[in-house]
Amino acid sequence: MKPSIVAKLEALHERHEEVQALLGDAQTIADQERFRALSREYAQLSDVSRCFTDWQQVQEDIETAQMMLDDPEMREMAQDELREAKEKSEQLEQQLHVLLLPKDPDDERNAFLEVRAGTGGDEAALFAGDLFRMYSRYAEARRWRVEIMSASEGEHGGYKEIIAKISGDGVYGRLKFESGGHRVQRVPATESQGRIHTSACTVAVMPELPDAELPDINPADLRIDTFRSSGAGGQHVNTTDSAIRITHLPTGIVVECQDERSQHKNKAKALSVLGARIHAAEMAKRQQAEASTRRNLLGSGDRSDRNRTYNFPQGRVTDHRINLTLYRLDEVMEGKLDMLIEPIIQEHQADQLAALSEQE
């Protein structure tokens, strides 16, 4: 491993020990805000510190085994130990390189999840409902909280569009690669000839930003309309104009919220989603400029990107970005998404490592 990387790891390991000592200090405990910030930093440094300690121990094992090679009686055993230690050292070095990759500051944040029916009419709306259920099951398994912000139901079930806030540890980091196009191939319940239809939905995942980081929105740039909350088929949920529709005139972004009975609460929710959407649009524009010289393997997360195909007759799900096909569709639709999410994250890390190697 390069001396510069070892020096960086030593500094991080020392900082980990320093933060650990600070967390036991009475003054730190008395200052709750500082205590929370240091607790987060300690958690972030723990993996790299532990891995570096293991790597240092393996280097000592390699040194000991090399010294034993000079002893004829110990040579055979030393050769075995040396081979094992070198293999372990390589594995730990790979882990350390991944742990040192630049972190997305949004990864630990809560996220807004939007699922929108695309081409395919009623069948697309039904699939949007299936996708939202899939993500809800995944969130439940990870003990995340799901709060519906806005929902427009399909005439025969499912959703034309649904927006939810998902709260918990590392939500955005796990779900951010879900953004893009999701295609379904199956025989609709209304299809008498047994023909397979293709429908599509789009998914957008955006980090929830703290108030201090929300983009500045000029109230003069907003058109705010009120209307009555309605359920499927136009049934009125209540008789007051509590639902809110906010249009951001410069970008044309529209957000509706009708989940709460209070107009004030709906407006607050809609503004938080609007801020996240504007931020996401600005980020996409910046990433597009950065990627103009080099195409990201994982796609842009744009709605037009085709992420996955869910083929029900074959029980198959295919992630087109990394050419991964699994015949475990039933499990995926029940929320067992790690088998799809982990390979995407690993591909992203490999992409980052390759980019760093090019820079070096």
UniProtKB/Swiss-Prot annotation:
The modification N5-methylglutamine is found at residue 235. Peptide chain release factor 1 directs the termination of translation in response to the peptide chain termination codons UAG and UAA. Methylated by PrmC. Methylation increases the termination efficiency of RF1. One of its GO terms (molecular function) is translation release factor activity, codon specific. One of its GO terms (cellular component) is cytoplasm. Pfam families: PCRF, RF-1. Residues 284-313 are annotated as: Disordered. Keywords: Cytoplasm, Methylation, Protein biosynthesis. It comes from the Bacteria. Gene3D superfamilies: 3.30.160.20, 3.30.70.1660, 6.10.140.1950. Belongs to the prokaryotic/mitochondrial release factor family. It is found in: Cytoplasm. InterPro entries: PCRF, Pep_chain_release_fac_I, Pep_chain_release_fac_I_sf, Prokaryotic/Mito_RF, RF-1. This is Peptide chain release factor 1.
